[in-house]
Amino acid sequence: MKTNYEIRYAAHPEDARSYDTKRIRRDFLIEKVFSADEVNMVYSMYDRMVVGGAMPVKEVLKLEAIDPLKAPYFLTRREMGIFNVGGPGVVRAGDAIFQLDYKEALYLGAGDRDVTFESTDAAHPAKFYFNSLAAHRNYPDKKVTKADAVVAEMGTLEGSNHRNINKMLVNQVLPTCQLQMGMTELAPGSVWNTMPAHVHSRRMEAYFYFEVPEEHAVCHFMGEVDETRHVWMKGDQAVLSPEWSIHSAAATHNYTFIWGMGGENLDYGDQDFSLITDLK
């Protein structure tokens, strides 16, 4: 196995206004989340979130501590949320064994020393997408399915934004230090998410898009309300959203995305909305 990581530094919104397409994609887009028998990570300076993916095929993959953590093991001072977006797989945390099927999630609290990822069937490998944030204490590990989620049905087909927001790793479902994660599924015929757009200066966010057909794409919108930019994305890619940035998208097909947040509070509703007509 191999662990790959890179560090992404934070940008001032006034500086980001001058970024060209190449720079925007370099600083915010995470193009390669999954590689066979590898663990890929981005260590972001936005609330020190780590965004990553593990795709075990022929090997069992270990969650290794990367140098920026300066810690004996990855979850020494961190918590983690994991979603399986591939074939059936297993996550082992110490002596605990968690079977994760498609679109099932797992919360791991601080203190888990030995964490591994494996696939049940190498022909249909699991894809474990994860977010990790600093944690001040340990909370119990817990598997969460859509049946456990707080579900909000939003939008309309006429508005091209009919979707179910599955709040899965949130404080209404289980205790966390600062991590919140969930999964939004757009209905056929709907392509817009998070519109009207909002920001939450108390928290950063990361989006991971999947269930995007190969011949289709997602246009992710970011930036300040009056200085928006776009990032064209494919399926199985992620994007970082600073606390000062909107995070929205439209696509050429319906899709699903996983959102993960961390920062000042655990209040999902702490959002500063903007009018659609104010976007520039």
UniProtKB/Swiss-Prot annotation:
Belongs to the KduI family. GO terms for molecular function: 4-deoxy-L-threo-5-hexosulose-uronate ketol-isomerase activity; zinc ion binding. Keywords: Isomerase, Metal-binding, Zinc. Zn(2+) binds at residues 198, 200, 205, 247. Catalyzes the isomerization of 5-dehydro-4-deoxy-D-glucuronate to 3-deoxy-D-glycero-2,5-hexodiulosonate. Its EC number is 5.3.1.17. It is an enzyme of class 5 (isomerase). It comes from the Bacteria. Pfam families: KduI. Its cofactor is Zn(2+). GO terms for biological process: D-galacturonate catabolic process; D-glucuronate catabolic process; pectin catabolic process. It catalyses: 5-dehydro-4-deoxy-D-glucuronate = 3-deoxy-D-glycero-2,5-hexodiulosonate. Binds 1 zinc ion per subunit. PANTHER family: 4-DEOXY-L-THREO-5-HEXOSULOSE-URONATE KETOL-ISOMERASE. InterPro entries: KduI, KduI/IolB_isomerase, KduI_N, RmlC-like_jellyroll, RmlC_Cupin_sf. The lineage of its organism: Bacteria, Pseudomonadati, Bacteroidota, Bacteroidia, Bacteroidales. The gene is kduI. Pathway: Glycan metabolism; pectin degradation; 2-dehydro-3-deoxy-D-gluconate from pectin: step 4/5. This is 4-deoxy-L-threo-5-hexosulose-uronate ketol-isomerase.
